[in-house]
Amino acid sequence: MEVPVLIVGAGPVGLTMAALLADQGIASLLVEQRDGLHQAPQAHVVSARTREILASLGIADEALARVTTPPADARYVTWRRNLAEEDIARIEIGGEARFVQLDSVSGKRSANVPQHHLERVLFDALAGRTHCETRFGQTWRAAEEEGDRVVSRIEDAASGEVYAVRSQWLLAADGASSSVRRGAGIAMAGDTNLAHMVTVNFEADLRPLVKDSPSILFWTLSAKAPGTFIVHDAARYAVFMTPYFPPHEQPADFPVARCERMLRAALGTAEVPFRITSLSHWTMQAHVADRYRQGRTLLVGDAAHRFPPTGGLGLNTGIADAHNLAWKLALVMQGRAGEGLIDTYGAERRPVAVANCEASVKNFHKMREVTAAMGIDDRRLPLLGRVRSSAPARALPGAVRSAIGGLFVAPVEWRTRRIAKAASVRCAAIRQRVQRAAEDQMAHFSTVGLDLGHAYEGAAVRGDGTTAPVAPDPVRDVCQSLTPGARWPHFHLAPDAGVAYRTSSHELLKPGHFLLAGMGRHGPACERLAASLGLAVVGVNLDLAASHKALAQLIAWNDGQTDATLLVRPDGHIAWRSTAPQPPSLDEVSAALCAILQITPSRLLQPLDNKDMQ
């Protein structure tokens, strides 16, 4: 069979990629090795930028709200000895101050949406589109390039049949262990084996334990069961993650019975019944691919980068990858852009992945400051794993092994219990120190700068000699601007702007379309110019579309100048700006577009031929 695009991997990034391409008239086949969507939570942080992208796909806020942890239940991040005991430290990540900050820079707020629910929302959105087909139980085996096509070998799990799929492009969205990436010979570089984790998915009603500190995350500081609870739905289900320590311990050392004992210890009470629904194990890594393209194979999402989960950046970086690539791929396939535009994908997105990877690793190491503030040495935990798993220890009776383990566990348990209860003046002082260390972790949970603040450079941006402003804290804050390369800023529209029920400037962006927006003397010309460009361009007069307050913001973002024309790419990043006294001519705007798309003016105006794309 032959398809325009073959996408391998039906996780959130692959599903998003297929939907974005479909909306631009590009057909795809999406194949997935699993026999269906994920059934358990994995990633769960959905950032403001990701929600903007999902909204562009027509996914309504109401659809996400039905599967989102209520903000009131995800207000804090808390540290306890176990889930049943009192807080040792707590920080607020979902308070009003943070919402005010988010609302000033985006029309969407970040949310906790468990991945298996997000996949279902995306799959349902994809099912309503033409130009895309999804097949489960299909394993990608190999590929080779033949001229301007890639021939992939796919194995059907049900029949065992191996069949060929010819495509113009092959997209690897098959996760951190990507077979497609390995097949393309693309290497990953970075930190390996940062940690090894067992994940316990379980059902329980945790409301009696968490009602006084409604938190999305609870860190348990018990030596019996150190780890992290992710409380997606306190009434129904949650996740517990705990480390193990190769080579002394292996996943096989954690059967259901042992995980039940560890989970009971982490809960800290026998009063809460639970049922383990699944177990998994994984290795925490921090890798970024050397390149995002090899011939006609492109990497997106975790196939291109894998981060520690500390920061919740992985899924969101992947969704933004798809958003950056989809419009470029569509225009190249439609003959409206030169193939060099594809190379700007890796040039723009790889630096973002490197920055997000570094931030995630920093967060991971910084979390140790909390246990260090308690006077606990994390290095004792691998030693415990070594002792309890050594050959001599395994030969001992269970009671003796427990006694040996107790030599390591008891001092830590005694210390954390006294600190939690502030049992002495010294313990109270330590608890205050732990609280300060916890408060110093906010960069882990507030990453709006990383989410919205990056500005692209390179061939797909026509710079004007200015540099996008950078916030004093580029992780937690963002400075909006009209600088080429920056994200199109969020501002409020006028009530009578002709876009009923739309409040954010991002509602002006139409999938697969450029936006030509003008202010001051440039405004009226932009609507006229947009209709003459021979490409999908929406023209907007910002003097009419923006609210009165927003116009003042726009002038400030434009370095105090009242006149400007802004060409915004389909992925919502500013491609070009003119601040000349007079509006730009059609030739000037066409020249900017042609430079970005790497084509001649004659190709810009030629009729669109989509017959090979569907």
Where are these regions (language model features)?
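Glycine-rich FAD pyrophosphate-binding loop
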Residues: 22-42
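A conserved short coil-to-beta-strand element within the FAD-binding core of flavoproteins
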Residues: 136-150
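FAD/FMN-dependent oxidoreductases across multiple families
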Residues: 252-313, 317, 337, 352, ...
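Conserved FAD-binding catalytic core of PHBH/FMO-like flavoproteins
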Residues: 63, 124, 169, 173-284
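N-terminal Rossmann-fold NAD(P) dinucleotide-binding loop
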Residues: 14-15
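Active-site-adjacent segment of FAD-dependent monooxygenases/related oxidoreductases
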Residues: 42, 47-125, 221
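Core beta-strand elements of the Rossmann-like FAD/NAD(P) dinucleotide-binding domain
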Residues: 3, 159-169
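Helical substrate-recognition/capping region of FAD-dependent monooxygenase/halogenase enzymes
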Residues: 2-4, 8, 23-24, 33, ...
